[in-house]
């Protein structure tokens, strides 16, 4: 398969991000896997990318530090060549309610889930070669279609990123497409035990989890769907309608 350029996948060593990194490799991209710290999972993810016949590199960055986020696209380019696919998968998911929301929780979610993807998108657009087209995919959440009062700061950050996705689709057209993927109950979260996760799955229309591989299928579709921009695919077994 021809080299389609390089992909930068934030949070690319674990959970959904890892699947998306491998799918990018399957689609013909060399992959820069962003992590906060290098560990065995990061090395294993890089190995999976290389198993697809693509190059892989691991980059470290605390996305709450704007200067580090700004530099990340350039670091990926230095290792792998021009970055033509940006996948913003890294995310913070902490519980708070409006009654106990504080500045620390607000800043944690907004800096990681909203500000960092925007900073990365800006750097991506600035560095994209004039003769190339690009794609940005933001990992959102079905909650943006059905917001609730729990996980208050998290939901606000993802809802704002969904608005930004549509705004960026307009601002960066025609050379860069911008889309989102909205997971539902995909993997048991740190706030759930197996019974909690099963109960959440049972609330969906299809009564089954939206497996990480389904997120990968959505990414592969968006890579190839050259007439699609400003959209979110809710891969949530219909949870946003339940």
Task: Go through each PLM region and give its residues.
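Substrate-binding pocket helix/loop in short-chain dehydrogenase/reductase
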Residues: 97-98, 102-110, 200
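Conserved glycine-rich cofactor-binding loop
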Residues: 13-15
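Short, small/polar-rich loop/turn modules that mediate ligand/substrate recognition or access, typified
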Residues: 81, 173-177, 229-230
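Conserved glycine-rich Rossmann-like NAD(P)H-binding loop of the short-chain dehydrogenase/reductase
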Residues: 29-43
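Catalytic loop of short-chain dehydrogenase/reductase
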Residues: 95, 135-173, 185
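Conserved NAD(P)H cofactor-binding loop of Rossmann-fold oxidoreductase domains
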Residues: 89-94, 238
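C-terminal substrate-recognition "lid" of short-chain dehydrogenase/reductases
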Residues: 211-235, 240
